[in-house]
Amino acid sequence: MSISAAGVATGLGANVELKSNVGSSSSSVAGVRLFTSRKAQLRRCAAPATSASLYSDANYDLNNYKFAPIKESIVAREMTRRYMTDMITHADTDVVVVGAGSAGLSCAYELSKNPNVKVAIVEQSVSPGGGAWLGGQLFSAMIVRKPAHRFLDEIEVPYEEMENYVVIKHAALFTSTIMSKLLARPNVKLFNAVAAEDLIIRGDRVSGVVTNWALVAQNHNTQSCMDPNVMEAKVVVSSCGHDGPFGATGVKRLRSIGMIESVPGMKCLDMNAAEDAIVKHTREVVPGMIVTGMEVAEIDGSPRMGPTFGAMMISGQKAAHLALKALGLPNELDGNYKPNVHPELVLASTDDETASA
């Protein structure tokens, strides 16, 4: 099949096409070899419940363009009603993922495959993605060491293949792709510009998070009467990154209340040791709270890994399956996992998934 670059690789030019043969893992854009899933194919499905547009005429006149009329109050009501409905829905949820960097997004994506699991993502920044919008030192390319490239195949992110690693031409391509797929799923809600100020603790178990608007959380020294809100959860996944003003907040709070002994911080950089250690030590550190991503290095003293991102993705996936295990659901760790995918939203990535969807 032939896919227009305008819809897949924006910025390559109107005359460039991304050609992909189903059953083949290679593609070519302007002479650069790219790779996508070997078995990827666009699946046809029933029309979604809501339409992308009420108007089917593509030949509109840009010189005399007119929008449909609307009352300002309708805009306010639509935004407010939906947000408040989401807050009510997720006031008591299955999993809260704190931090929407590459590990948190990968975790939420994996969890969202089960449409019966409610997932709330809490991100203090207006723009989710953490450090995954760029590679190292503000450079564009994202490096992912093998075999983590299989996750890129699943979510349909093109890359250039090298011997032991792959290169995504811009890190934003990964982040925007996984977010667009994840947030389209009805069992997921992203609460960005919201900070997790504290944890809900019952006995020896983490039972949710204390939330507030990020701007309030950042200005408690001048705003003394801004009480927070809460989200109860069966499982909290802390993916708050390495130490910083809003970094490693989950494990630092556990240390301050004596639920863990220490947070030694990450050691100096060693890419080869770091990525294996991050995935290996992703775990439930106390009942009800799983730690993933670079926050794992803070609690275990693992080396920092620098600008390689594979461990973030796989650590996030492992955290998701730890959460599924904690919920008593099928998971990869117990060897009984069969993803219940959203057939109307995802690209088939394996023959088995295609057959079961």
Curated annotation (Swiss-Prot):
Enzyme Commission code(s) on record: 2.4.2.60
The species this protein was found in: Physcomitrium patens
Entry note: cofactor: Binds 1 Fe cation per subunit.
Keyword Repressor: no
EC top class, as a word: transferase
GO molecular function, one term: cysteine-dependent adenosine diphosphate thiazole synthase activity
Keywords: Chloroplast, Iron, Metal-binding, NAD, Plastid, Thiamine biosynthesis, Transferase, Transit peptide
Cellular-component GO terms for this entry: chloroplast stroma; cytosol
Catalytic activity from the UniProt record: [ADP-thiazole synthase]-L-cysteine + glycine + NAD(+) = [ADP-thiazole synthase]-dehydroalanine + ADP-5-ethyl-4-methylthiazole-2-carboxylate + nicotinamide + 3 H2O + 2 H(+)
Chain's gene name: THI1-1
Organelle transit peptide: 1-51
Domain of life of the native organism: Eukaryota
Binding-site list for substrate: A103, E123, Q124, G131, A196, D227, H242, M294, R304, M305, G306
Post-translational modification: During the catalytic reaction, a sulfide is transferred from Cys-225 to a reaction intermediate, generating a dehydroalanine residue.
One GO BP: thiamine biosynthetic process
Species lineage: Eukaryota, Viridiplantae, Streptophyta, Embryophyta, Bryophyta
Keyword field contains Translocase: no
Compartment list: Plastid, Chloroplast
Task of the protein: Involved in biosynthesis of the thiamine precursor thiazole. Catalyzes the conversion of NAD and glycine to adenosine diphosphate 5-(2-hydroxyethyl)-4-methylthiazole-2-carboxylic acid (ADT), an adenylated thiazole intermediate. The reaction includes an iron-dependent sulfide transfer from a conserved cysteine residue of the protein to a thiazole intermediate. The enzyme can only undergo a single turnover, which suggests it is a suicide enzyme. May have additional roles in adaptation to various stress conditions and in DNA damage tolerance.
Cofactor: Fe cation
Positions where 2,3-didehydroalanine (Cys) occurs in the chain: C225
InterPro entries according to UniProt: FAD/NAD-bd_sf, Sti35, Thi4_fam
Subunit structure: Homooctamer.
UniProt name for this protein: Thiamine thiazole synthase 1, chloroplastic
Family statement: Belongs to the THI4 family.
